[in-house]
């Protein structure tokens, strides 16, 4: 699901007013959760799109065309609400494998959470379900059985969290369309390790103060202040284990909307 640029500032302003009016910043629902156990856990999986396709175009996390190119390409997956976490679970990586020994390989497939799916066939909110690209779903099969496994449609699987590893990539910040000196919205890309974000802060030029940004949807965060003065430093804190990273002056003073600015650092590619 893509939100039109004109809607994003409205969401950010609404959240800013809501939180300001409450007198305090409400705690993030999932921020204190630890990374799920690395043991294998049960779930179900389906697939969508073309048989050898990359799955969704865009998705509820807001990665847009990134999902159509490597390293995302064919590795994307929509996850049920229990893993999506209102968008805070965007970017998390999982290994998945199916159980039927007659068609399933022992090899696990790594996928990145880029979209939200329904809860699966049980329709229970706490049910864990993955809706994979056709290519990723087929890769769970033993050689020559990709078509057979896709014809099953629905599979019982095992899954576990795994560290995200974007080889040769550092964390990047995409400035969303519609951003101004009074409303700035950022999308986080290529986060190694846990992959998710629990909080995000920004620091203006010449300031020592870190200002909290608001989570608006998917992997998008925003700030309503003004006028904002770059260059901007950005501090990220992971959702699962509260690891922190600060990218100094990563967004230049002459920043423009729709541009992506890449840092020189990343989290360690471990959980």
Swiss-Prot record:
Residues 1-24 form the signal peptide. One of its GO terms (cellular component) is extracellular region. Residues 182-263 form the Expansin-like CBD domain. It is a peripheral membrane protein. Glycans are attached at residue 242. Keywords: Cell wall, Cell wall biogenesis/degradation, Disulfide bond, Glycoprotein, Membrane, Secreted, Signal. Its main location: secreted. It comes from the Eukaryota. Transmembrane segments: none annotated. Coiled coil: none annotated. SMART domains: DPBB_1. Disulfide bonds join 61-90, 93-164, 98-104. Belongs to the expansin family. Expansin B subfamily. May cause loosening and extension of plant cell walls by disrupting non-covalent bonding between cellulose microfibrils and matrix glucans. No enzymatic activity has been found. This is Expansin-B1. It comes from Arabidopsis thaliana (Mouse-ear cress). The gene is EXPB1.
């Amino acid at each position: 699901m893509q939100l039109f640029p004109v809607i994003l500032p409205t969401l950010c302003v609404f959240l800013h007013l809501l939180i300001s009016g409450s007198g305090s910043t409400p705690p993030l629902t999932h921020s204190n959760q630890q990374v799920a156990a690395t043991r294998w856990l049960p779930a179900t999986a389906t697939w969508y799109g073309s048989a050898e396709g990359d799955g969704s175009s865009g998705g509820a996390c807001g990665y847009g065309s990134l999902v159509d190119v490597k390293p995302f390409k064919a590795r994307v997956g929509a996850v049920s609400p229990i893993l999506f976490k209102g968008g805070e679970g965007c970017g998390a990586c999982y290994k998945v494998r199916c159980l039927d020994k007659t068609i399933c390989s022992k090899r696990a497939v790594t996928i990145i959470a880029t979209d939200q799916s329904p809860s699966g066939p049980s329709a229970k909110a706490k049910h864990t379900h993955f809706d994979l690209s056709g290519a990723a779903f087929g890769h769970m099969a033993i050689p020559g059985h990709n078509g057979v496994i896709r014809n099953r449609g629905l599979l019982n699987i095992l899954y576990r969290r795994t560290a995200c590893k974007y080889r040769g990539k550092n964390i990047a910040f995409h400035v969303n369309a519609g951003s101004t000196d009074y409303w700035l919205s950022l999308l986080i890309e290529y986060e190694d390790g846990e992959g998710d974000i629990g909080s995000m802060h920004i620091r203006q030029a010449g300031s020592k103060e870190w200002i909290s940004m608001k989570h608006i949807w998917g992997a998008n965060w925003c700030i309503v202040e003004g006028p904002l003065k770059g260059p901007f430093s950005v501090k990220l804190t992971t959702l699962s284990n509260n690891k922190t990273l600060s990218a100094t002056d990563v967004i230049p003073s002459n920043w423009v909307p729709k541009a992506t600015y890449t840092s020189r650092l990343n989290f360690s590619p471990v959980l």
